Curated annotation (Swiss-Prot):
Record protein name field: Ribonuclease Z
SUPFAM superfamilies, alphabetized: Metallo-hydrolase/oxidoreductase
UniProt gene name: rnz
Organism in which the protein naturally occurs: Exiguobacterium sp. (strain ATCC BAA-1283 / AT1b)
InterPro entries: Metallo-B-lactamas (IPR001279), RibonucZ/Hydroxyglut_hydro (IPR036866), RNase_Z/BN (IPR013471)
Residues in coiled coil: none
Function: Zinc phosphodiesterase, which displays some tRNA 3'-processing endonuclease activity. Probably involved in tRNA maturation, by removing a 3'-trailer from precursor tRNA.
């Protein structure tokens, strides 16, 4: 899984950061996590192809997370996108999106499905398991835990050779079948293949203050994407507006033993104070990045 941040600011666009938008590359398809105003314009500076986007996951319905969605859906159609697309989001998304497309006379040349989720829902999309949890914000906001598919184990070539099996197509048969035959005898393939390799886990949180569901989503994740709208000195402001601070994000990363933390949704008040902001994050959780627009990160790097 590879992520590219299309917008890392909060509230409104700035010269330094666009509003929320994140692309998740799953090798042969792409997902968007939120689609704030200008997201499709940001995509012009990347290699992301709208027609390859198969799903959009909306964390909540604040404008800085959804105002770019109708435009993106229309542009995808104009660029000859014909494959079906599913938009997942909280209650109210379907009504708003259908009204916007209807009132603007927007016609989509592909099948659009809008699925409204609730706390605890799970979905299988493009062979990935997505778990949805409700967070704590001034407005209904959610986060996602994305479990990638496990990969087959490695062939134990040493054991296979002990049987006298020559290299060739039978090696693939052993890996992909429950049993295999060699010289008139049948063998259980699992005895000659290592355990399956677990898929990568990515947790992506919408706007939130610290809460138990955030912990459930992040627990043991290879990557946690967490908002950090404010630095710790503005903790009172963070609580007033339903957001998290840098140290609240790092505290969760530490508590959940995540592999990597990337903080995003950064307030424009910190323009010119970027080094100070970064230091506050990495001093508490060294395996951290502060997202900037167009940052790319491959899970496992």
């Amino acid at each position: 899984m590879k992520l590219q941040f299309l917008g890392t600011g909060s509230g409104m666009p700035s010269k330094q950061r666009n509003v929320s938008g994140l692309a998740l590359d799953l090798s042969n398809v792409t997902w968007l996590i939120d689609c704030g105003e200008g997201t499709q314009h940001q995509m012009l500076y990347t290699k992301i192809k709208p027609r390859k986007v198969t799903a959009v996951w909306v964390t909540h319905l604040h404008g800085d997370h959804v105002f770019g969605l109708p435009g993106f859906l229309s542009t995808r159609s104009a660029l000859d996108g014909t494959a079906p697309l599913t938009v997942y989001g909280p209650k109210g998304l379907k009504k708003w999106l259908e009204a916007t497309l209807r009132v603007t006379g927007s016609h989509l040349g592909y099948e659009l499905t809008v699925t409204e989720y609730s706390d605890g829902d799970t979905f299988i999309q493009d062979d990935h398991l997505v778990t949805v949890r409700k967070l704590e914000h001034r407005f209904p906001s959610f986060g996602f835990r994305i479990d990638g598919p496990e990969k087959p184990g490695m062939l134990r070539v040493d054991l296979v050779r002990e049987l006298g099996v020559p290299s060739g197509p039978i090696y693939r048969t052993i890996k992909e079948s429950d049993r295999f035959e060699f010289e008139g005898k049948w063998y259980d393939s699992k005895e000659y293949v290592t355990e399956p390799i677990p898929g990568k886990i990515v947790a992506i949180l919408g706007d939130t203050i610290p809460c138990e569901n955030a912990r459930k989503l992040a627990d043991g994740a290879d990557l946690l994407v967490h908002e950090a709208t404010f630095m710790e000195a503005e903790q009172a402001l963070a609580r007033k507006y339903g957001h998290s601070t840098t140290r609240e994000a790092t505290a969760l990363a530490n508590a959940c033993a995540v592999g990597k933390l990337i903080v995003t949704h950064i307030s424009a008040r910190y323009v010119g104070r970027e080094e100070e902001f970064v230091q506050e994050v990495v001093s508490d959780f060294p395996s951290s990045l502060v997202a900037t627009d167009f940052l790319e990160y491959t899970v496992g790097d």
